[in-house]
Design a protein with these regions (language model features):
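Small/aliphatic-rich secondary-structure junction motif
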Residues: 2-60, 160-224, 240-244, 283
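Phosphate/nucleotide-donor binding subsite
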Residues: 70-94
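A short acidic, glycine-rich active-site loop
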Residues: 61-71
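Charged docking surfaces used in two-component/phosphorelay signaling
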Residues: 91-100, 224-230
Length: 283
């Protein structure tokens, strides 16, 4: 997704899930974002152990929206549609979950993907095997990675957001403007003022070329460090207890086939907050 695309209204959100307990926080984020954007939310069921006749019952969209106070008790599918929210539930058609995701995204491009991640693994349990590199490199899709061991910025029980502190790793390669644009939009839509947006420079990067969106309730700050950029990013995230990390990933660091040991994956392994990864513009 380009910076211009990210700035546009999100119309399609894709959420692959195994419906495990660990996936519930990611589902809450996917549903809240779909609700805010009045978007179509496609939920792909990737657990082959659940019977076909039972998969449509989970996750429970209407009960969740009722719990959040968005829908009344005993609401109908029409009530969901009246919110401007579209819900599609599909099963993975390939035995390998990664292949199923790639097939789906190839046939039905999305504006945002929401994935649960697991500490020390970086990926959901069902995303272990690599996908053919040429295919994964073409999957230019912004992805919100939500660690299963944190609450994130959407309260699973109430649907309320808590987005006060945002961290943006800055670099010249890839350029960081798409991350800045995405962070500004996220702060506008879901932020809870006052909001602090911190730029982390793992080096002496020049930000003169960056356009920082302004808002009376936002404060932009900067941190500079030398050495391992991942260590600086994770340390800053922990010290400031950030609610989300927003960063640009290189084209070859595809969100579906992140290179083992890449900066993005190492951040996913150690992050204590959701990570919004924006693919670098293709040249």
């Amino acid at each position: 997704m380009t910076a211009a695309d990210q700035a546009a209204t999100i119309q399609r959100i894709f959420h692959p899930t195994d419906f495990s307990e660990d996936s519930h926080v990611a589902f809450a984020h996917a549903l809240k974002l779909a609700l805010i954007h009045r978007a179509e939310l496609t939920i792909m069921h990737v657990d082959p152990t659940v019977a076909p006749e039972g998969f449509e019952d989970f996750p429970r969209v209407r009960p969740t929206l009722t719990q959040w106070g968005v829908l009344p008790e005993n609401s109908s599918k029409a009530d969901v549609a009246n919110l401007g929210l579209g819900i599609r539930k599909i099963r993975a058609l390939a035995a390998d979950a990664k292949q199923a995701i790639v097939h789906h995204l190839t046939a039905s491009p999305t504006d945002l993907m929401v994935l649960a991640t697991h500490q020390h693994e970086g990926f959901a349990r069902w995303l272990h095997h690599p996908v053919a590199e040429p295919v994964s490199r073409e999957m230019q899709v912004a992805t919100l990675f939500v660690p299963s061991h944190v609450g994130g910025f959407v309260d699973r029980a109430t649907g309320k957001t808590s987005l006060h502190r945002m961290l943006l790793p800055i670099s010249t390669d890839p350029p960081s403007q798409p991350a800045v644009d995405a962070a500004g939009k996220l702060a506008t839509q879901l932020g809870t003022p006052p909001i602090t947006l911190t730029l982390v420079h793992a080096g002496e990067e020049d930000i003169d070329g960056l356009h920082l969106p302004q808002n009376d309730s936002w404060t932009w700050t900067q941190l500079f460090g030398k050495g391992d950029p991942v260590e600086w990013i994770l340390a800053a995230g922990a010290e400031f207890d950030v609610d989300v990390i927003v960063m640009v990933t290189k084209g070859q660091d595809s969100v579906l086939d992140l290179l083992r040991g890449s900066t993005t994956e190492r951040i996913l392994r150690g992050a204590r907050a959701p990570v919004l990864a924006i693919p670098a513009p293709q040249v």
